[in-house]
């Protein structure tokens, strides 16, 4: 019996070891508890459906259809060639914005890196972005922006006199882009000659079209045109930078007059100054960020005020009270803008319904769990403004235009996110508020209007844009 006993003991030991190894192997190889969802077709994933809902004017459909299907505020998919977790709702916004550089970091598609290549040999686009965010706050904080209000008003007045006055009909979106781009050129690098600014305008539109196109670098493709446009603008910016360096040396330019001067005179922790190509890259990024989203907001302000006369009347009343309180010819100032409370609530409601920034990507820098689901390192995460902006749990009757949502304490935290949030919140948020309010003031003082195409379609690609650029019929106020 003894041999049988030892044989049984050996078999028991082997069985135990085998089961242990199987358990360890199975645990390591078992699938992660990923959020529910489908990855779509090979390579393209669900990118076409993600984009097509925007082209049809309802980008939120991609989000809400899947939230309902999976009964979850997190779902997995594959977009822009990446395994992605789409994070919906205020709790997701809070989690992502609060864990920047802890669990997640900013991420851009490769196409963006190719259109905006960093010129620093030891940095990447993320590191350059971090450096910029350390540089910008002193220019975009309210106390610094106060001195720009009058300049913005001068530029807005000239813009309306030149492009709106004495016109029966105008097309809003191109003019809104012209206004915000001229402001950015003037305030970031003191360029205000419209002919000089116009030289940049068309290439910038090519860049905007190429960023969201397929990254196919062949002659004639939008992506190829965007790369060429980026290179052209860089060369033009370097000419401006070289001249500013001369002007600073000769004392004809001020060290504090704009961001460009500051960049030329700023050195890093090692005492090294930025080279001209590096500065050109940063100014290029600022010019894009400084006018694209604001021009969308201004365009949709015109759209909604044209559709909602009762809202227009309240904005007009507030703006005329401010105008009548000032001596003739006096420019707007900081105190005037602080009085535009209802007007800003209207602007916020516009950005809730038509957020210029539809969402943003992050990349998981480590494995982590969220809401009971595994998020693997390297996966991308996408937050969506529409997941809260058009969610009845966050904003009752979400399709109704109601500026009173922003009275008092306003919306609940992390539900209204037109500028993002956390460390990556748009540093130009206050700057955007100024340019939008100055635009609104000069607009409603001059005109009422109606849409030429009452049911004009909206396209989101990647910003919301009226399909025909919003033509309107102008009715000047009688003197």
UniProtKB/Swiss-Prot annotation:
It catalyses: beta-amyrin + 3 reduced [NADPH--hemoprotein reductase] + 3 O2 = oleanolate + 3 oxidized [NADPH--hemoprotein reductase] + 4 H2O + 4 H(+). Its EC number is 1.14.14.126. Its main location: membrane. The keyword Membrane applies. InterPro entries: Cyt_P450, Cyt_P450_CS, Cyt_P450_E_grp-I, Cyt_P450_sf. Disruption phenotype: Severe reduction in root and shoot size. It is found in: Membrane. The chain crosses the membrane at residues 5-25. Changing residue 355 to L: Loss of catalytic activity. The gene is CYP716A12. Heme binds at residue 426. GO terms for cellular component: membrane. Keywords: Heme, Iron, Membrane, Metal-binding, Monooxygenase, Oxidoreductase, Transmembrane, Transmembrane helix. This is Beta-amyrin 28-monooxygenase. Pfam families: p450 (PF00067). One of its GO terms (biological process) is saponin biosynthetic process. The keyword Membrane applies. Involved in an early step in the hemolytic saponin biosynthetic pathway. It comes from Medicago truncatula. PANTHER family: CYTOCHROME P450 26, CYTOCHROME P450 716A1-RELATED. GO terms for molecular function: beta-amyrin 28-monooxygenase activity; heme binding; iron ion binding; monooxygenase activity; oxidoreductase activity, acting on paired donors, with incorporation or reduction of molecular oxygen, NAD(P)H as one donor, and incorporation of one atom of oxygen. Belongs to the cytochrome P450 family. It is a single-pass membrane protein. Expressed in roots, nodules and flowers. Its cofactor is heme.
